[in-house]
């Protein structure tokens, strides 16, 4: 046996620190998997609730707004609560709150009860992104955190595919309420995992938890050297583009299931259809990232939005068997644009105000994503689901002229 194997030298603290970092990454990735999966699970539930409660399209949009609104509005307060009471406690409490909401969905006998539970679930889901990303930045160096955050993001995409498809599979043999009980059981196990893996002595005050996707999406880039009026116009255009892009995603995912149901798809088939879109979305981040390096930001965004518009428009008129063929490409185009837009926020903001710029960008984007399903829902009640999806497809094309200020800014800087 080596004489140094048991010596209390510096290797022991380093190994302990690495072990703790791995536990933190494992715990936060597990939380991301559950929270993102449980969030996108609602797209399957909306179609079920529409039949059970006899909801209109506007009411479905309202349910989506309640969850997304609660989740987006409470992210910054969640960071403050984490700093005050401890990130570990708040993250566990949020996970438990979301789990309890899922567990009680099946007991709802009225729409009001369901709406209250949806708000509770949204509040619980709000804590995961800011606090998990804060944990990772505390326990990993700048270079290591990029890899760790990529791993963390990957598990979020896994959750979006696995949990909705699990619900869909369970619907073949049990009721949706019973299926949610099994998913809630997984949520309780995730909470237990957070209790066992996350460190008790995390000092949140030493870190700055950022809202939602800001920490794990923000690239380390320098701002473009451009005149301030040009920067403002370009950044304003970028915020509007992000808002329309997010509204397109939420609108499509909320109302496409109803189009498929009208053409003969069962609740189980709709769940698997959404899973295919989420799988395509995971690949979309990679595909659009590669495109942006080869074609540039402007051409990549224009191409992805035109493709999104064409696919959504095609689905509005296509029979069910053709819609199935378009689901994966839709996911690629629908989810890929956002990864390109995130990289432009840092470039089009002032060097000392990038954190504020991300806060403005995500507030506009998430706010529009929460509000537009209600507007689309009211349109659906008047025009029908098919015409609503046509409206969604046409609205995407409004992004194209908004790219002009951004192109002017990048050309001025010589990029």
Residue positions per predicted region:
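Interfacial helix-cap and linker-helix signal at transmembrane-aqueous boundaries
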Residues: 49-50, 81-82, 169-174, 260-261, ...
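Helix-loop-helix hairpin linking two adjacent transmembrane segments in secondary transporters
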Residues: 152-202
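Structural signature of the two symmetry-related core transmembrane helices
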Residues: 89-103, 299-313
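Extracytoplasmic gate region of multi-pass secondary transporters
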Residues: 42-43, 233-282
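Cytoplasmic helix-loop-helix junction between adjacent transmembrane helices
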Residues: 117-156
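Residue-level signature of mid-helix packing/kink "hotspots" within the transmembrane helices
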Residues: 40, 68-76, 161, 278-282, ...
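Juxtamembrane intracellular "pre-TM" segments in multi-pass secondary transporters
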Residues: 8-19, 205-238
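Helix-to-loop junctions at the C-terminal end of transmembrane segments
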Residues: 74-86, 285-296, 380-381
């Amino acid at each position: 046996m080596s004489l140094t194997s048991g010596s209390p030298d510096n290797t022991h603290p380093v190994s302990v620190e690495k072990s703790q970092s791995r536990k933190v990454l494992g715990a936060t990735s597990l939380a991301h998997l559950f929270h993102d999966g449980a969030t996108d699970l609602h797209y399957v539930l909306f179609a079920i609730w529409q039949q059970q409660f006899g909801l209109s399209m506007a009411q479905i949009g309202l349910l989506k707004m309640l969850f997304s609104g609660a989740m987006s509005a409470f992210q910054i307060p969640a960071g403050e609560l984490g700093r005050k009471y401890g990130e570990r406690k708040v993250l566990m409490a949020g996970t438990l709150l979301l789990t309890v909401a899922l567990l009680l969905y099946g007991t709802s006998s009225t729409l009001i009860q369901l709406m209250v539970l949806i708000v509770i679930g949204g509040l619980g889901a709000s804590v995961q992104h800011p606090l998990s990303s804060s944990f990772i930045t505390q326990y990993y160096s700048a270079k290591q955190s990029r890899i760790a955050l990529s791993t963390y993001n990957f598990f979020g995409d896994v959750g979006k595919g696995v949990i909705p498809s699990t619900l869909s599979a369970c619907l073949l043999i049990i009721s949706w309420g019973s299926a949610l009980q099994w998913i809630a059981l997984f949520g309780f196990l995730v909470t237990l995992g957070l209790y066992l893996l996350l460190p008790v002595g995390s000092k949140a005050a030493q870190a700055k938890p950022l809202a939602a996707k800001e920490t794990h999406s923000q690239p380390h880039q320098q701002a473009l050297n451009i005149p301030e009026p040009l920067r403002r116009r370009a950044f304003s255009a970028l915020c509007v583009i992000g808002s329309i892009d997010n509204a397109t995603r939420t609108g499509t995912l909320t109302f496409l299931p109803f189009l498929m149901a009208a053409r003969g798809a069962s609740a189980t088939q709709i769940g698997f259809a959404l899973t295919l879109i989420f799988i395509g979305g995971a690949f979309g981040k990679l595909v659009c990232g590669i495109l942006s390096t080869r074609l540039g930001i402007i051409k990549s965004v224009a191409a992805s939005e035109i493709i999104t518009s064409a696919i959504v428009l095609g689905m509005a008129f296509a029979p069910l068997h053709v819609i199935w063929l378009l689901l994966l490409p839709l996911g690629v185009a629908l989810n890929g644009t956002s990864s390109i837009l995130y990289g432009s926020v840092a470039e089009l903001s002032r060097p000392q105000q990038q954190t504020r710029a991300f806060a403005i960008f995500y507030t506009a984007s998430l706010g529009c994503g929460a509000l537009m399903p209600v507007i689309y829902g009211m349109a659906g009640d008047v025009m029908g689901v098919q015409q609503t999806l046509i409206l969604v497809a046409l609205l995407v094309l409004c992004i194209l002229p908004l790219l002009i200020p951004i192109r002017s800014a990048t050309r001025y800087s010589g990029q």
